[in-house]
Amino acid sequence: MSAPAWDIIARIETPFDQKFGVPRQSGIAACPGRIVFEKPFRDADAVRGLEGFSHIWLIWQFDRALRQGWSPTVRPPRLGGNERVGVFATRSPFRPNGLGLSAVELERVARDEPDSPVLYGRGADMVSGTPILDIKPYLSYADSYPDASGGFTGGDAGGMLTVDFPPELLARFDCGQRQGLICALAADPRPRYLDDPERVYGMTYGGRNVRFTVSDGTVQVIAVEG
């Protein structure tokens, strides 16, 4: 049996140009996203009625991890990056088919732009340019299980850090980008095995390099470059 051929229906534009700093799960940080359909699928009829839903599912491809192949076991960040578990017990990108699944907030469907229809949303956990393979509406009556167990994750987003972001540096970003950036930093983008309070990290966001340190549960932004 031949392998299925996936059609890329759209690509998402996000503030993240690199993998470092991208939220580990969707919905953790309200970062803006813009979904632009590929020309064969750029049809207003295809999204008719979608604006009635507050959230959507995005099925997408870990295109930057495909060349590295898959692994039966991985080391999830929630376990400190040292303990291995099965890949199917995680959302690791190193999967046999390299597919990702994200629930994001749908803010609006734009129909008056040159490349319309365009979807605007928040909460995506993807690098800018990531290929989208399918879009489905989120159905709260079918997709939400409040009593579900979370396995080794504990069922929550984990501890969030305090963010000290000097106002003059935060002002370098558009108003629509600021809250998402603060949330992404609060979610601790560092590899879990790195805990050096003297180390300066750099995260690209919105075309700028955010330089910061982490000490005693606080992210201290020290510079914004670019």
Residue spans of the language-model regions?
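Mixed-charge, low-complexity intrinsically disordered regions
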Residues: 1-99, 111-120, 124-226
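Conserved positions in beta-strands of structured domains
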Residues: 104-107
